[in-house]
Amino acid sequence: MDSTVPSALELPQRLALNPRESPRSPEEEEPHLLSSLAAVQTLANVIRPCYGPHGRQKFLVTMKGETVCTGCATAILRALELEHPAAWLLREAAQTQAENSGDGTAFVVLLTEALLEQAEQLLKFGLPRPQLREAYATATAEVLATLPSLAIQSLGPLEDPSWALHSVMNTHTLPPMNHLTKLVAHACWAIKELDGSFKPERVGVCTLHGGTLEDSCLLQGLAISGKLCGQMAAVLSGARVALFACPFGPAHPNAPATACLSSPADLAQFSKGSDQLLEKQVGQLAAAGINVAVVLGEVDEETLTLADKYGIVVIQARSRMEIIYLSEVLDTPLLPRLLPPQRPGKCQRVYRQELGDGLAVVFEWECTGTPALTVVLRGATTQGLRSAEQAVYHSIDAYFQPCQDPRLIPGAGATEMALAKMLSDKGSRLEGPNGPAFLAFARALKYLPKTLAENAGLAVSDVVAEMSGVHQGGNLLMGVGAEGIINVAQEGVWDTLIVKAQGFRAVAEVVLQLVTVDEIVVAKKSPTHQQIWNPDSKKTKKRPPPVEKKKILGMNN
C-alpha cells in the first residue's frame, strides 16, 4: 500500500530533507514509529488470504491438537496465541464485531492495518500524533455520516431474505452455498414474529454424518444429535421436559472418599441407601410429571432402569450448545442436580427421526406457528460439517441485524470505493492536518477492494483503476467479482448498513488508541538473588553484591 501521490504535508518535508542524509538501503529498514504496527501487520497477514468470497482456507491446528480446515477469520483469531498487547486489542475488537453482528471480522483487522500504515506515513512527514488522532476521528465521523446515503436497498418484512444473506454465506466458500442460504433464509423468515422481532436462539442447527451438504434440510421443531438411552424411545403426546447439566445417576460416582464398613450388614445398608436415594430422585421427577430428561453428563445403568420403570425418556446430549438451545426454546432452567424443575419445558412430541444414516431427536410442537425450526446439516466429514455449521450460525446472526435496521448497502468493495472517492474529494480541498488525513483514510479504504481482487486472482491494478473510473463517473454500484468488476445490484451482493457502521466504529476505536502509543512497558517481578552452592559447606550463600558502583548523570548511585 505504497502512496504514490504526495499529500500537502509531504512536499515541504521532502524539500527540507538534509542533502547529507542518504536514503537507506532495503537491508537497513527504518524502525516503525508506531510500535504496534508490526504486530498488527503480522495478524493481518494471517487473515488477508481468507478475506472475501474467493478467499483461501487454512489448516488450523488447535491447542488440543485438532486439525481444522477453515477460512473463517473468527475461528482463526480465536485459536491464535498472541503476546503483543496491540494484537490482543485488535483481536478483541474483531471478535466483538463477530459476536454482535456475525460478520465483518476480517474487515476490522484489514482496515485497522491499512489505517495504521497510512498513519505512520503521516507521522514520518511530521504530523504530530494529537493532530493525527483528531484528524482520523474527523474522517471517521465523516464516513459514518455518509454511510446511510449509500443505503439504496431495504429488506421488506415479507421479502425473501436469501439475497441479503448471500454475502455472509459466500465468505465461507462452501460448494452448495445457494442451497444452504435458502435453508437458513427460510428458517429465519418462518421464525420471525409478526411485530418484526427475531430471536436467533429459535433456529437450531443439528449436524449428522452421512450424505452430502445438498442433503441438508429443515425440520419442524428443535432437533439435536443426542442419544436415546433406555427402552423408552418417544413421547407422542404431552411431553414435559427437564434439563440436567449433570450425570443421570449418583452425584459423585467416583468420589475419592472411602466408606468405613465394618461388616457385611454395613455394606448392604450402604448399597441400599444409595439405591433408595436414586429411586427417590427419579420418583420425584415422575411425580412432577416429567416424562423426558435431557442430560449432559454420563448415564448410569441402574438409574436408567429406574427411568424406564417410571416411563421417563432419557436423552444424552452431545454438546452443551444443544442443551442450551433447548433451555432457551423450552423456557426451562438447566439444573445442576436431579431435582424436578419448577417450570418444566413443554412440547407436543419427542421422538427419533432417521435421516439417511444419521439419527436425530426431535422436539416438536403441534401449533402451526412452531417456536423453533432446525437446519439439519448432512456431510461426510467432520471438517465439512463444522465449516457448514459456522456458516449457518453466522448467517443467523447476520439476519438478526436487518431485523433491527433493514437498510442495505452495496457489497463486494463498492461501499469502500464510494467512501474513498468521497474522502478524496473532500481531502483535496481541506487545509491543515484534515486534508492529508482524509486522503490517507481514502487510500486505506481502497485497500479492501484491492484485497478482494487479489484473492480472486485478478489483475489488481487494472481492476482498481477500472473501479475508480466508474465510481468517478457516478456509478457507485460497481464492485469486485470473480472475473472482474460487477454490478452488485444485479448480482444481489449487499452488506447490512448496521454491521458496516459497527465495523467502522470498532476500527476507529482501535486505531485512535494505537496511534498515541509510543512504546510498550511490561511489568515484571523483580529478579530474586541467585544462590551459590558451596560443596564444602552445608549452607547456601547468597551471591555478594558487586563492589563497583555505576555513575548515572555524574552522581554515585
From Swiss-Prot:
According to the UniProt record, one GO cellular component term is: chaperonin-containing T-complex
For this UniProt record, give its keywords in alphabetical order, as a comma-separated list: ATP-binding, Chaperone, Cytoplasm, Nucleotide-binding
GO terms (BP aspect): protein folding
Where found?
Answer: Cytoplasm
Region Disordered: list its residue ranges: 1-33, 528-557
Predominant cellular place of this UniProt entry's protein: cytoplasm
* Gene3D superfamilies per record: GroEL, GroEL-like equatorial domain, TCP-1-like chaperonin intermediate domain
Q: Which GO terms describe its molecular function?
A: ATP binding; ATP-dependent protein folding chaperone; unfolded protein binding
Q: Which function does this protein serve?
A: Possible molecular chaperone; assists the folding of proteins upon ATP hydrolysis.
Family to which the UniProt record says this protein belongs: Belongs to the TCP-1 chaperonin family.
> What's the protein name?
Putative T-complex protein 1 subunit theta-like 1
